[in-house]
């Protein structure tokens, strides 16, 4: 073996060190230590796998495995920082129970719903799936099949799945788990502006004078963004931080003012602020007159429950999203009852504190950034709350300029990029189009090369309705990808678990690990994770980021994209389309669904030579799959305010914020000079509306569906903690994160604990009409609820706390309220 002088010096240094330690090294071994490629770490960029912040990380790989990650110093989002979860990304793919081959419930050598999980080949898995799907399609039609996806799908995975369901199977029964986190934000954006997603960007953090958190614990849930707020606050003494919540948490530690309000009363607080602005002549009349219209929301709209539920039957206008035009004077009259006295009485927040908050919004010289996540969205009036905060910013003209921003923070890494922009919701198509609009269907059918009438006009079953339809045997074949809804979703015992185990139904779960959802399924498909595949995510500030595959997957695991595309080969077009459609498109006769969807001359037009050598999906299908899907998808938005850059560009940058026009990203939408779609001379142009004007929408306080009573005397709020991601599927398999927070606990006020004879660490039973869980109490932790409320995180699979949550939703967004339901707490003897 030839040795350079440099290697010789290194080898001798290693040998000398070994000799001092009393170890003898062969010369060849010393040489290997000095010069072997085995010791080299290769670094490449990728967006973080966890939240919607969109941090970029550098991934270190060695010998086909991820061995390290670090914050990307070139990334404008996180500037080299990571949160504690991000620092342990290298370990999420290597849990000891990682699934490596398909598992089918079998007895006596064949599928049996009551059988044991048995390893099978991919062919057996897909053949079994196809048999079940074909039987359901033949018997009941396309409404009998469904899919539940994810804001953690890559852009390409979500696009392929939505295309397969809506164009191939002709079923709109596809919905993402983003229904549980961002649906109210989506409807809020669409009602007020006509276009989804924030108008501002993360640059606002460096310009704002006041930050107002409406139901968001950013210190734990968006910690990297929280560092930017912290830096702004500590380096600029005039800056104020305001935190509103139903319980005390870590974000209060930085707050200049904290506001603990009674559950649901945020509606009253927001209306009070609007009233204060009007009463104190703080309305920006020039902005309001030029750029807004006023509407009244239909009220008494129910709670998205089953039609036969007594609460739903009581509603005068169940599920109505209708609005009527009103004047400013009528709007003024609608908020007038929300005086400081009334708002204080309803919320429990002191009058002087409410006035202090309102003044920050009213002061024309104070730039305000409002921020929210699940506290506002997971709310039976979440859409209204989104609108009420927009009202405040529109009344004052504090919008779409640096530091003035109502900013809906996203929970998942691609809830924006995939669930929302791609349109994997049951009612949506890409680029904010909807299935109910014939013009939108026509655009999709043209891009997808479909005959007219292919895409059904009726929205499919949303997430909560999917559970009910599985329970009732209406939905029979169901594919779950990239989420753990059996643990995360509401009312587990009442709807979901009976639906999964309904003998009429066949449930497929694609996941890297044996989650609670997987264990309730009939077939489990092992899934590739993160950089085991190529993909793209879209974060909360409209930033699209792409990454290359960097390691191979484990065992026989395959990406969700591979699974969708490969499964589509099992169907001839005659098995999924009626004769009248085939007559309009005879070129598809005898073809497979794969041929129609993915070998269509568009998706498959980029040769394999353009892909990297390590790209398992592309090498399997014989063309550059990810680029083809991305470029076809991008056709929907280009020229329509959702412009994306060419796919290859994203591999050369740390993301771009759409719309990207002539190679330039957009920081502040709707503002002339920043947004290329804003008309010249307009100042502001809310071009999502036909007249270019945003809506100020009047909506009152309405009570939650349930409240504590004599038997169930405590509020329960569920949520997350810093160390774990959602249900802990990944983070609980990282030893350091698991050891840091091994178990969920019940955070309770010391006086509530004392009244029940409880001490810190005691085990309690938390129960209500929907179930019960056992958990230990914590009276001194990071979360400190007021009397009458407890907080329990949902990451712990041993404590399925969300089984207690009522499956009531916002009737407009169909998003569940996980933040308030009545429970009782008793000590376990």
Curated annotation (Swiss-Prot):
Coiled coil regions, renumbered to chain: none
Disulfide bond in keyword set: no
First and last residue of the signal peptide: 1-30
Cofactor binding mode and count: Binds 1 [4Fe-4S] cluster. Binds 1 molybdenum-bis(molybdopterin guanine dinucleotide) (Mo-bis-MGD) cofactor per subunit.
Binding-site residues, Mo-bis(molybdopterin guanine dinucleotide): 85, 152, 177, 181, 214-221, 245-249, 264-266, 374, 378, 484, 510-511, 533, 560, 718-727, 802, 819
GO molecular function: 4 iron, 4 sulfur cluster binding; electron transfer activity; iron ion binding; molybdenum ion binding; molybdopterin cofactor binding; nitrate reductase (cytochrome) activity
Post-translational modification remark: Predicted to be exported by the Tat system. The position of the signal peptide cleavage has not been experimentally proven.
Domain of life: Bacteria
Top EC class, one word: oxidoreductase
Family, similarity comment: Belongs to the prokaryotic molybdopterin-containing oxidoreductase family. NasA/NapA/NarB subfamily.
Biological role: Catalytic subunit of the periplasmic nitrate reductase complex NapAB. Receives electrons from NapB and catalyzes the reduction of nitrate to nitrite.
Protein name as catalogued: Periplasmic nitrate reductase
Protein source organism: Vibrio vulnificus (strain CMCP6)
């Amino acid at each position: 073996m030839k040795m350079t002088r440099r290697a010789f010096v290194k080898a001798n240094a290693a040998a000398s060190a070994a000799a001092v330690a009393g170890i003898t090294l062969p010369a060849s071994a010393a040489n290997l230590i000095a010069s072997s490629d085995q010791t080299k770490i290769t670094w490449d960029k990728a967006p973080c796998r966890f939240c919607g912040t969109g941090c970029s990380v550098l991934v270190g790989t060695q010998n086909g495995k991820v061995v390290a990650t670090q914050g990307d110093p070139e990334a404008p989002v996180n500037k080299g920082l990571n949160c504690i979860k991000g620092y342990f990304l290298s370990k999420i793919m290597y849990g000891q129970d990682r699934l490596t081959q398909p598992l089918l419930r079998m007895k006596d050598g064949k599928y049996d719903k009551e059988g044991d999980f048995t390893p099978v080949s991919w062919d057996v898995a897909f053949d079994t799936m196809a048999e079940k799907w074909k039987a359901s399609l033949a018997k009941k039609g396309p409404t009998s099949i469904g899919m539940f996806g994810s804001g953690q799908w890559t852009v390409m995975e979500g696009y392929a799945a939505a295309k397969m369901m809506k164009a191939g199977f002709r079923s709109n029964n596809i919905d993402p788990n983003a229904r549980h986190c961002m649906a109210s934000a989506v409807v809020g954006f669409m009602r007020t502006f006509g276009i989804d997603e924030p108008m501002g960007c993360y640059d606002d953090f460096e310009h704002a004078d006041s930050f107002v958190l409406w139901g968001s614990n950013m210190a734990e849930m968006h910690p990297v963004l929280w560092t930017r707020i912290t830096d702004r606050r500590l380096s600029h003494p005039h800056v104020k931080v305001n935190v509103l919540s139903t319980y005390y948490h870590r974000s209060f530690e930085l707050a200049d003012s904290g506001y603990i309000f009674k559950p649901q009363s945020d509606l009253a607080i927001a209306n009070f602020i609007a009233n204060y602005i009007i009463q104190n002549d703080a309305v920006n009349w020039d902005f309001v007159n030029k750029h807004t219209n006023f509407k009244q929301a239909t009220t008494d709209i129910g709670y998205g429950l089953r039609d036969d539920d007594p609460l739903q039957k009581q509603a005068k206008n169940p599920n109505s999203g209708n609005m009527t035009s009103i004047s400013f004077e009528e709007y003024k009259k609608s908020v007038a009852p929300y005086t400081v006295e009334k708002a204080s009485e309803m919320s429990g927040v002191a009058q002087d504190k409410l006035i202090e908050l309102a003044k920050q919004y009213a002061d024309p010289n104070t730039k305000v950034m409002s921020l929210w996540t699940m506290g506002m969205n997971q709310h039976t009036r979440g859409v209204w709350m989104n609108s009420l905060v927009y009202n405040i910013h529109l009344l004052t003209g504090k919008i779409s300029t640096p530091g003035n921003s109502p900013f809906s923070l996203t929970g998942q890494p691609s809830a924006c990029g995939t669930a929302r922009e791609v349109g994997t919701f049951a009612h949506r198509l890409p680029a904010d189009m909807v299935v109910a609009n014939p013009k939108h269907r026509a655009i999709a059918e043209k891009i997808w090369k479909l005959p007219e009438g292919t895409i059904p006009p009726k929205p499919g079953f949303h997430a909560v309705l999917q559970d009910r339809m599985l329970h009732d045997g209406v939905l029979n074949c169901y594919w779950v990808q990239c989420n753990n809804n059996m643990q995360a979703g509401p009312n587990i015992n009442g709807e979901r678990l009976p639906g999964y185990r309904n003998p009429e139904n066949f449930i497929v779960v694609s996941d890297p690990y044996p989650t609670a959802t997987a264990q309730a399924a009939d077939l489990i498909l092992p899934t590739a994770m993160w950089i085991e595949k190529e993909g793209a995510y879209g974060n909360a500030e409209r930033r699209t980021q792409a990454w290359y595959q960097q390691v191979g997957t484990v065992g026989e695991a395959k990406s969700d994209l591979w699974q969708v595309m490969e499964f589509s080969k099992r169907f001839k077009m005659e098995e999924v389309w009626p004769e009248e459609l085939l007559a309009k498109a005879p070129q598809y006769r005898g073809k497979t669904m794969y041929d129609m969807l993915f070998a269509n001359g568009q998706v498959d037009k980029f040769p394999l030579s353009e892909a990297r050598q390590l790209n398992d999906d592309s090498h399997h299908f014989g063309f550059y799959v990810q680029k083809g899907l991305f470029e076809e998808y991008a056709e929907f938005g280009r020229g329509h305010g959702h412009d994306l850059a060419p796919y290859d560009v994203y591999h050369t940058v740390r993301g771009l914020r759409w719309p990207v026009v002539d190679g330039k990203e957009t920081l502040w939408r709707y503002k002339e000079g920043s947004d290329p779609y804003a008309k010249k001379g307009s100042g502001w142009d809310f071009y999502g509306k036909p007249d270019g004007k945003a809506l100020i929408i009047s909506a009152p306080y309405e009570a939650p569906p349930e409240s504590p009573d004599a038997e169930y005397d405590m509020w329960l709020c569920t949520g997350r903690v810093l160390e774990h991601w959602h249900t802990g599927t990944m983070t609980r398999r990282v030893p350091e994160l698991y050891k840091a927070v091994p178990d969920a606990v019940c955070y309770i006020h010391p006086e509530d604990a004392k009244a029940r004879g409880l001490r810190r660490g005691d085990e309690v039973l938390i129960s209500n009409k929907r179930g019960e869980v056992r958990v230990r109490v914590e009276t001194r932790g990071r979360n400190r609820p007021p009397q009458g409320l407890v907080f329990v995180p949902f990451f712990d699979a041993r404590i399925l706390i969300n089984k207690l949550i009522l499956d009531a939703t916002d009737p407009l967004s169909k998003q569940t309220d996980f933040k308030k339901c009545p429970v009782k707490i008793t000590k376990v003897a």
